[in-house]
Amino acid sequence: MRSSLVLFFVSAWTALASPIRREVSQDLFNQFNLFAQYSAAAYCGKNNDAPAGTNITCTGNACPEVEKADATFLYSFEDSGVGDVTGFLALDNTNKLIVLSFRGSRSIENWIGNLNFDLKEINDICSGCRGHDGFTSSWRSVADTLRQKVEDAVREHPDYRVVFTGHSLGGALATVAGADLRGNGYDIDVFSYGAPRVGNRAFAEFLTVQTGGTLYRITHTNDIVPRLPPREFGYSHSSPEYWIKSGTLVPVTRNDIVKIEGIDATGGNNQPNIPDIPAHLWYFGLIGTCL
């Protein structure tokens, strides 16, 4: 009897101490793949200065599912506002989507070298929250324009799903933008790939439970960028994390993705191993390489 009780409490403690892991459905896997391609398309220079109504295309087979859907541009922007925010707003009639895609940094090494760790209050998004100064300032500088563009698209297509997405810096911008516009009554899902931490623990907790859409935070093996800025500077990651455990240049399958729950959970990308830059460029294919 005593040994049974000991085993029970040990098992219970282990369950509490360890992050909860679950696999993803085939439908969600397909969405991860599609929005990774929308994120990849934002790196293609011609897609950031494209006339409205033209089709989204990519070099190097970076976005075949987007091309197959005959997605078109509603609006594109390049080097806008603070931090040279770049990307596009797209209409996908095949999948009934309105997609805002933010481009990531052109040079990962330079971005890491110039990364600042300053946090600023963002109480207009959530009480007690502090966000990365660069990410929040960049979003604020283009928010009015993009808010209006999204609003116009939703008015024209009220039954379409709204998705914000991006890789690296683009994922950080998509996360902040989604949190901000949900507060204005929009239903927005966010798919971020290899995104850095965007704020303090209060902000991470808010992102975890915020209504009006879902945040899908996807990471890959030991990608260096999701480990920045360091937790020692007051930063935290939201829950859950969808961690791709297969290696760089290895095709990703549904069984390679693990859903890990818990703010700042360990066992996914957040492990005590050597971080890797090439891992940052492989999310369901090469991402960030379209010119």
Curated annotation (Swiss-Prot):
It comes from Thermomyces lanuginosus. InterPro entries: AB_hydrolase_fold, AB_hydrolase_lip/est, Fungal_lipase-type, Mono/diacylglycerol_lipase_N. This is Lipase. Residues 18-22 form a propeptide. Keywords: Cleavage on pair of basic residues, Disulfide bond, Hydrolase, Lipid degradation, Lipid metabolism, Signal, Zymogen. Residues 1-17 form the signal peptide. One of its GO terms (molecular function) is triacylglycerol lipase activity. Active at alkaline pHs (up to pH 12 approximately). GO terms for biological process: lipid catabolic process. Used as a detergent lipase. Sold under the name Lipolase by Novozymes. Engineered variants are sold under the names Lipolase Ultra and LipoPrime. Active over a broad temperature range. Disulfide bonds join C44-C290, C58-C63, C126-C129. Its EC number is 3.1.1.3. Transmembrane segments: none annotated. Belongs to the AB hydrolase superfamily. Lipase family. The active site is at S168 (nucleophile), D223 (charge relay system), H280 (charge relay system). It catalyses: a triacylglycerol + H2O = a diacylglycerol + a fatty acid + H(+). Changing S168A: Decrease in liposome binding. It is an enzyme of class 3 (hydrolase).
